[in-house]
Amino acid sequence: MPSSPDTDRDTDPDTAPARRPRRGLRLALALFALAWIASAVYHVYKPLPPGIGVAGPLRSARDVALLTDLTWTDPQGARHSDQHVFDEALRLIGQARRAIVADQFLFNDFGSENSGEVRYRKLSQELTDALVARKRAVPGLTVVLITDPINTVYGGRVSPQLQQLREAGVQVVVTDLARLRTPNPAWSGLWQLCCRWAGNDSDGGWLPNPLGPGKVSLRSWLALLNLNANHRKTLVVDQGEDWTALVASANPHDASSLHGNVAVRFGGAAALDLLASERAVAALSGAAWPRALPTSVPRESIVDTTSAPRVQVLTEGRIRDALLAAVDGARGGDRLDIAVFYFSHRRLVDAVAAAHKRGVAVRVLLDPNEDAFGRKKNGVPNRQVAAELVAAGVPLRWCDTHGEQCHAKLLLRSGSDGKIELIAGSANYTRRNLDDYNLESSARVIALDDAPVARQARAYFERSWSNTDGRSISADYAKYADDSTLRKIWYRIAEASGLSSF
């Protein structure tokens, strides 16, 4: 029987070589896609480096205080700023005799070049000059500065501040972010395969610098899209025979100098817990830890007392655990006050709404997500979360910003038992900040409600919430209310996927 034309075509040996390259291409694409997916999944769930994501012991502490930066307008509309965080940091640096260890996220003057009539404080140079001056005054002083690669645009620019510190003998450690888990697996899975190994150079590029003036390479942009960071803002110094620490929400970044911020200062063994957490960051970045620095905390310094304030150092995901425990543990008769720059973490949003429902007196003060260094924002995620909380009956106000940001990250639980619990530091209430993607540091304080730190925390929140003393700091919910369905959908997608700047 004669064969059909279709059969002849399928068995024609001349067509087989043409099909083989197509099959090879499909196989190569399938293998590449598999490698991409495998890389993405691994870098979301890979083990954390040693010493990351820790909760230190709850230790008795001395000299515990809440320091604040506030910006407000007076009845005539003039803007004022009252700053204490970096004033205290500079004071502590100026008295150090043995060691200074700082970990600072934004440490640059990017964004201040287009300030117009706004006068920013030159925080990046103030901190640089203070560290250099102290190193010169005390040549044997050990000084370590840990920072994020954003300050060099991921290797694409030379940082004049970091260069000045290196020339003065300061050990500068740029964090190796590739060792961390990724919040943006869709991109980072590919970047880990194709681009991480390409490195970068600071000799200039052809693309605009996304953060400031000048040009950078394509590799800077590709690294930026990983969207993770060493977001810590800490300082540990010796003070006499003891150690003192600051855990802050504030960055030494000129264009951030008008932001509202908070910091917890404490002395004693908990400062050495914070120092140990910074040693872990140096280790994951391949940096040697100076021998002059303590590597352990004396066991006898762990003291459980109900009279003195107690401090616990928290990092990364353990901050989330402490926040959830504080909210879930609040009962009728307790008060829960929250002031935060970004609020989008789903478990925490639900926990706050549930606390209000069971009779806790909840108040939430949010940044309207209106401004970012001269650029207008769309209000995501805070306005969408605010609408949800207000619908649940939670009292909520906005920081009444005028170009600056309400950059604090603070939770204050005032218990009916006469004690307060304060959690403050670098971590915004987002998936990226609380779920072991960024490096973060916060301090948890337990104190009697008449302790100085308790009075300071209550005064800070009341002043911001109630606009006392003729200072306009906050505004009613209606001013920035946003019920857009599209932006609500985008917030949910961005929070779940990591494809966002928050």
Residue positions per predicted region:
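Charged, low-complexity intrinsically disordered terminal segments
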Residues: 2-5, 15-502
